């Protein structure tokens, strides 16, 4: 049995705002609906919003859902959260916000909060008269999961927004990979690519903000081995290690043999599937840029 919070159970047994908002032609307001999921896949959500046209605020919201305890609770929570928000404010509500409002969801049920976020977005764009295909480029990417019709762009977005690290987590959030399983290797590749890009971005944003001051005599004399080791250690300490430590990892200089720099990856870096990217992007490229373009970094 799933371990649900008291808030989840409360909104499951006594859901708030369940039902339909009828468009009765009330002056000054407009009703819109967003739908996601499908009954065939086991989860479907229809979200209704009533918007005050002049202020662009959501004055009422209700839902209809076909799904489990988490689906009902997530939908009910969302309708409570968005009342009184402008449409632009509501668009900022994430699936994490929905889960936090509920005090957390079992990871295998996180896709219910994702459905809520997507239904809200669909309702708002329907209200604004913008076809979903126009604003949502996720379906333009290559199809990764044929069982649930999930594109590469959607997998990539959900990995980035929720900091996911495994294909199993992706399945829990958007069901991709939960059918025949043939796409799990592709999902792993996407996660790896996201990690590599994140490592490069973190290094540029953090490590590159204050370059190490490398003394320059103006003469192109080769560095002695002692000088080279000292400079490598300086760059590692000042530019590389702070970035890795912030992500739960670290690096230690082990040896320098000519242009071969041997290091020991520690903490999260040592067990991370993207350790090769860490070596090449976060360490080797920085040492080449700061000291010598012929340096090669190897892990021991």
UniProtKB/Swiss-Prot annotation:
One of its GO terms (molecular function) is 2 iron, 2 sulfur cluster binding. The keyword Metal-binding applies. Residues 201-220 are annotated as: Disordered. Keywords: 2Fe-2S, Iron, Iron-sulfur, Metal-binding, Nitrogen fixation. One of its GO terms (biological process) is iron-sulfur cluster assembly. InterPro entries: BFD-like_2Fe2S-bd_dom, BFD-like_2Fe2S-bd_dom_sf, FSCA_dom_sf, N_fixation_NifU, NIF_FeS_clus_asmbl_NifU, NIF_FeS_clus_asmbl_NifU_C, NIF_FeS_clus_asmbl_NifU_N. May be involved in the formation or repair of [Fe-S] clusters present in iron-sulfur proteins. NCBIfam families: NifU_proper. This is Nitrogen fixation protein NifU. It comes from Trichormus azollae.
């Amino acid at each position: 049995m799933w371990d649900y919070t008291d808030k989840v159970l409360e909104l499951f047994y006594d859901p708030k705002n369940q039902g339909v908002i009828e468009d009765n032609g009330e002056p000054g307001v407009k009703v819109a609906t967003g739908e996601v999921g499908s009954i065939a896949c086991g989860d479907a959500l229809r979200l209704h919003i009533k918007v005050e046209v002049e202020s662009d605020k959501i004055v009422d919201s209700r839902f209809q859902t076909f799904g489990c305890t988490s689906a009902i609770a997530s939908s009910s929570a969302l309708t409570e959260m968005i009342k009184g928000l402008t449409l632009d404010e509501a668009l900022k509500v994430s699936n994490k916000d929905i889960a936090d409002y509920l005090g957390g969801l079992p990871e295998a049920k996180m896709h219910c909060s994702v459905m809520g976020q997507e239904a809200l977005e669909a309702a708002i764009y329907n209200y604004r008269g913008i076809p979903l295909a126009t604003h949502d480029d996720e379906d333009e990417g290559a199809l990764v999961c044929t069982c649930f019709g999930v594109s590469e762009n959607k997998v990539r977005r959900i990995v980035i927004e929720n900091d996911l690290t495994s294909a199993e987590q992706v399945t829990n959030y958007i069901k991709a990979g939960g059918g025949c399983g043939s796409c799990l290797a592709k999902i792993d590749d996407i996660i790896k690519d996201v990690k590599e890009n994140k490592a490069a971005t973190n290094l540029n944003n953090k490590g590159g903000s204050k370059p190490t001051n490398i003394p320059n005599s103006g003469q192109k004399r080769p560095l002695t081995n002692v000088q080279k080791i000292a400079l490598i250690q300086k760059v590692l300490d000042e530019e590389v290690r702070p970035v890795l430590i912030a992500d739960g990892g670290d690096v230690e200089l082990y040896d320098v043999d000519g242009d071969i720099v041997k290091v020991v990856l520690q903490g999260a870096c040592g067990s991370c599937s993207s350790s090769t990217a860490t070596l090449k992007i976060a360490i080797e490229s920085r040492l080449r840029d700061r000291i010598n373009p012929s340096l090669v970094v190897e892990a021991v």
